[in-house]
Swiss-Prot record:
HAMAP family: Ribosomal_uL13. It comes from Limosilactobacillus fermentum (strain NBRC 3956 / LMG 18251) (Lactobacillus fermentum). This protein is one of the early assembly proteins of the 50S ribosomal subunit, although it is not seen to bind rRNA by itself. It is important during the early stages of 50S assembly. One of its GO terms (biological process) is negative regulation of translation. One of its GO terms (molecular function) is structural constituent of ribosome. This is Large ribosomal subunit protein uL13. One of its GO terms (cellular component) is cytosolic large ribosomal subunit. Part of the 50S ribosomal subunit. Belongs to the universal ribosomal protein uL13 family.
Length: 147
């Protein structure tokens, strides 16, 4: 009798990938990176185990916003104080804090559970070309073929 393969947390082989976000649409980038963080690209994917890889996103400041999203899409946050609702457009958000915008978009596509938070910790986003994870010897991943 055959049984479905279920990965164990200690048996997962993780890789490090570098993704260049230059000129790629934000949503397409986020969905592809979220899939890699979950491990959906592996044959050993198990829904209840974190089987994903580490991802480093570089050039987050040069991600592309299509259509009128730069002026029409509004991000809201609240300080939990009366009258503390803050808002800013996607264009302002991208100009002031591109790392946080890309990270927030990718984490929004992960499961909203404790396992999803663990998956989100494997994401590293940088606005420019350089990153601090050279010691991990990350592979360059061209996601234009995966989109």
């Amino acid at each position: 009798m055959r049984t479905t393969y279920m990965a164990k947390p200690g048996q997962v082989d993780r890789k490090w990938y570098v993704v260049d976000a230059k000129g790629i649409s934000l949503g397409r980038l986020a969905s592809t990176v979220a899939s890699i963080l979950r491990g959906k690209n592996k044959p050993t994917f198990t829904p209840h185990v974190d089987t994903g890889d580490y991802v480093i996103v570089i050039n987050a400041a040069e991600v592309k916003l299509t259509g009128k999203k730069a002026t029409g899409k509004i991000y809201y946050r609240h300080s939990n104080h009366p009258g503390g609702l803050k808002q800013r457009t996607a264009g302002d958000f991208l100009a002031k804090d591109p790392e946080k915008m890309v990270e927030q978009t990718i984490k929004g596509m992960l499961p909203h559970t404790s396992l999803g938070r663990k998956m989100g910790m494997k994401l590293h986003v940088y606005a420019g070309e350089s990153h601090n994870q050279a010691a991990q010897k990350p592979e360059v991943l061209d996601i234009t073929n995966l989109i």
